[in-house]
Regions:
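Phosphate/oxyanion-binding active-site loops and adjacent basic polyanion-contact surfaces
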Residues: 115-121, 134-145, 190-197, 220, ...
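Active-site glycine/GP-rich loop and adjacent strand/helix microenvironment
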Residues: 2-88, 93-95, 99, 107, ...
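Active-site diphosphate/adenylate-binding microenvironment
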Residues: 70-121, 127-132, 139-143, 147-158, ...
Length: 545
C-alpha cells in the first residue's frame, strides 16, 4: 500500500487531501460552486484520466500476452479459493485436487465442466457470486468502470460536469465502486443505495440540465419510464409542493406538458441537454433497449460499460460510438474459457479453447472460473467472435442456451424466437414490442388434450387488442425461421403458439417478484422463458386479451 502511495502522481495525492469530498459533482448545476469546489472537480477529472490511462496500459500488456495473462488469472483464482475452502468438492461428492494444477492445461484436465444450475447446487462450492451482491469484483470490473468512464467522458465531454448525471434506479450500471485511493471519485459513479426508484426519479426530474441518465439495466429503465407515465401527476404535485426540496411549480408544469405529448422523445423533452443513457448489459436486455430507443429515449445514444454475467464482468466495451454492443473478453480474472458451439451438432464439444485460440466467425459458450466458487461453470451465454484486440477476441452476445423452447425436440433458441416475434410484431399495425416471456404449455397444463405448444405473453404499445389473425402471424413466422418447427406443425406434433396481451406493469411486477426471490442474482437477467408455474401464473393473471 505504501508503494502504491509513492507511485501516485502529486495531483491525485493533493486530491485526497481536499475537503469536503466531491459530493458536489452530483449537485444541481444551479448550486453555487466555490473556488475550492471548482478546483476539486477539475482535479477529479484529471485523476480519473490518470487512473484510466493506467488501466489502459495494463489492458494493452495483458491482451498482448493473453496466454500468460490467463495463466496468471487462473493462479490467482486458485490461490484465493484455497484460503477459505481447502480442497474442492464437486457435484458428485468427489474431491478434486485442482490446487496443484498450476497450468491451464492441467487444470482443465482435472476439473470437469458443469452447468450453472449444477454450480449453484454444490454444497461446498456455493454460487458464482453471492445473490445479495449488487456489484461485481475482479480486475475486469475495475477496468470496465475506469475505462468506461474515460470513454464516456471522451465521447460526451460535458457528461461529467457537476450535476450532469443522475441514476434513476437503486442499482448502478457501473460494475464496481472505485476503490481506494480513487474512492474520492465515487460521486462520479453512481453507487447502489437504499432509495426507492420513485425518489431517485423525482430527484432527476428536479434537474432539467442532466446530460446523462443512468440505470442498472435497460429493463429497469423501462420500468422507470412506465412508472413515470403511470404516476406523472403524483410526481408533478410533489415537485410543485416542494416535497422534498423547494417548490418547483414551473418544473411541474413542464413535466405535465411533456407527458401530454406521449412517450416518443419524452426523455429529451424533460432533459433537453441529455446526450446518453448508461445501462449495464446483461442477458435479455436487447428488447428493452430497442423499446427505449424507439419511444422514451428516442434520439439518445446508449452506452454499456460492460457485459456482466453471474460470475462477474466478462466483457469490456471500449467502443461507445458503436450502436450495438461489441465486447472485449479480457484475459484477467475471472478465468474465461470458450466451449465451441456448432449449429446442428448432435454432440457437444469435448474441450474448450483459450482466448488466444478463438476463431473469428465462430460461436462459443462462455465457461467461467472465479475464486468465489471454484468451478468450470458453463454460463449458457453464447458469443460470436467478430474481431480481435491484440490476442483477445472481440465478441457480440448472441443468445442464452437456457432460454430455448423445446416441447418436441425442436429446440427454438432465444435469438431465433426473438427474430420470429420481431417479424410478427412488424405485421401488427401500430404495435411496438416492449416485453415478452414464453412458457411451455406443460408448465401451465394448458394443452388439455391438444398438442404441446408455447404460451407467449407480450406487452405492447400502440395496440390494445390482438385479433386472431394477428395472433396467428407469430406461428407463421416461427415456421419461417425454423424448418424443424414447421415440420412438427405440419405433422400436428406441436400446436400453434398462443399469444396473450398483458396489461401495463405486468412485466414490472414479474421482475419485482424475481428480484425478491432468495436465489436472485446480480446482474438481474431478464428471463424470456419461464420455468416455474407460480411465476408464469403471475403473468397469466394480467392477460387483457
Amino acid at each position: 500500500m505504501l508503494l502504491l502511495l509513492l507511485l501516485l502522481p502529486p495531483l491525485l495525492l493533493l486530491l485526497l487531501l481536499l475537503r469536503p469530498p466531491l459530493a458536489l459533482l452530483r449537485q444541481p448545476q444551479d448550486a453555487s460552486l466555490s473556488w475550492l469546489a471548482g478546483l476539486q472537480h477539475r482535479m477529479a477529472r484529471g485523476a480519473l484520466s490518470w487512473a484510466a490511462a493506467w488501466q489502459q496500459r495494463r489492458l494493452e500488456q495483458s491482451t498482448l500476452h493473453a496466454g500468460q495473462s490467463q495463466q496468471q488469472a487462473l493462479t490467482w483464482c486458485l490461490r484465493e479459493a484455497q484460503r477459505p475452502l481447502g480442497p474442492l468438492q464437486g457435484t458428485t461428492g468427489r474431491v478434486y485436487d485442482v490446487f496443484g494444477a498450476t497450468d491451464t492445461s492441467t487444470f482443465r484436465n482435472h476439473l470437469p465442466l458443469i452447468k450453472a444450475s449444477q454450480a449453484q447446487e454444490e454444497e461446498s462450492g456455493g454460487q458464482l457470486l453471492p445473490p445479495t451482491s449488487t456489484q461485481c469484483y475482479g480486475e475486469a470490473s475495475l477496468q470496465a468502470t475506469l475505462l468506461g468512464l474515460a470513454a464516456l467522458s471522451k465521447a460526451f465531454p460535458e457528461v461529467l460536469t457537476p450535476g450532469g448525471i443522475a441514476c434513476v434506479t437503486p442499482t448502478s450500471p457501473w460494475p464496481r465502486a472505485l476503490p481506494w485511493p480513487w474512492r474520492i471519485l465515487d460521486k462520479v459513479v453512481s453507487t447502489p443505495g437504499a432509495k426507492h426508484p420513485g425518489a431517485l426519479l423525482l430527484e432527476a426530474l428536479r434537474s432539467p440540465g442532466l446530460r446523462a441518465l443512468e440505470a442498472g439495466t435497460a429493463t429497469e429503465l423501462l420500468d422507470v419510464f412506465s412508472g413515470l407515465e403511470a404516476n406523472g401527476e403524483e410526481l408533478a404535485e410533489a415537485m410543485a409542493a416542494g416535497n422534498p426540496g423547494s417548490p418547483l411549480p414551473s418544473r411541474a408544469a413542464e413535466l405535465r406538458e411533456a407527458l401530454d405529448l406521449g412517450p416518443r422523445g419524452l426523455a429529451l423533452r424533460l432533459w433537453p441537454k441529455l446526450q446518453v443513457v448508461v445501462t449495464l448489459d446483461a442477458g435479455g436486455q436487447t428488447e428493452a433497449v430497442a423499446a427505449l430507443e424507439a419511444l422514451w429515449c428516442h434520439g439518445l445514444a446508449f452506452f454499456s460499460p460492460a457485459y456482466a454475467a453471474s460470475g462477474g464482468v466478462v466483457g469490456l466495451n471500449l467502443w461507445p460510438e458503436q450502436a450495438h454492443g461489441r465486447y472485449l473478453l479480457p484475459p484477467g480474472a475471472p478465468f474465461i474459457e470458450l466451449l465451441p458451439v456448432k449449429e446442428g451438432a448432435q454432440e457437444e464439444a469435448a474441450s474448450t479453447v483459450l482466448l488466444a485460440e478463438a476463431q473469428k466467425g465462430e460461436e462459443y459458450e462462455l465457461v467461467l472460473t472465479n475464486h468465489a466458487g471454484l468451478t468450470r461453470c458453463r454460463l449458457g451465454d453464447v458469443v460470436q467472435v467478430v474481431g480481435a484486440y491484440n490476442q483477445c477476441p472481440v465478441v457480440r452476445f448472441v443468445r442464452r442456451l437456457g432460454q430455448a423452447l423445446n416441447v418436441r425436440g425442436e429446440d427454438i433458441q432465444e435469438d431465433v424466437f426473438a427474430e420470429a416475434l420481431g417479424r410478427a410484431v412488424g405485421q401488427w399495425p401500430g404495435a411496438k414490442l416492449l416485453d415478452h416471456s414464453c412458457v411451455e404449455s406443460s408448465i401451465l397444463d394448458s394443452s388439455q388434450g391438444s398438442a404441446p405448444h408455447y404460451e407467449v405473453f407480450v406487452a405492447l404499445r400502440g395496440l390494445r387488442n390482438l385479433s386472431e389473425e394477428n395472433r396467428d402471424k407469430l406461428d407463421h413466422c416461427l415456421q419461417e425461421v425454423s424448418p424443424h418447427y414447421k415440420s412438427l406443425r405440419f405433422r400436428g406434433s406441436v400446436g400453434p403458439a398462443r399469444v396473450h396481451l398483458v396489461g401495463r406493469g405486468a412485466f414490472r411486477e414479474l421482475r419485482a417478484a424475481l428480484a425478491a426471490c432468495p436465489s436472485s442474482r446480480f446482474p438481474p437477467e431478464m428471463p424470456r422463458v419461464l420455468r416455474h408455474r407460480h411465476v408464469a401464473e403471475g403473468l397469466q393473471r394480467r392477460v387483457l386479451s
